[in-house]
């Protein structure tokens, strides 16, 4: 709270085994720091701790990442991922292993893309470039592209300024 008046902190692990990670830190941080008096029993005149929250991986992307990217509150975010996946229960089934490996690659792509986007933001040129890529794909698939009029209407809703604080914690693997 005392760091650029950020009142909240997001913990975003990209491994389902850490789906309760934010809850663990909620208890430790908010219970320990959620006080209105100092250790001598005197009232304090500063903020004592942020609201800690989060969700595993892409679950959060479809729930609250837009708030982190485009919202009016400064929300520092800690992203956590592992180079090697931790779910090996189905590795003996080649098709399942292949599917899980591909899924892990997608997770890592998202893990690296989110902090970069929060750093750089997206300006009008970037939005137009995204629509150009989307339209090229649609044309190739025989679908109608997004019209210039529609692009112009949507641009304000896709802009965000960047310069949002993040940490990326990337480890080799998650072990017990």
Predicted regions mapped to residue ranges:
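A SIS-like phosphosugar-recognition module
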Residues: 1-176
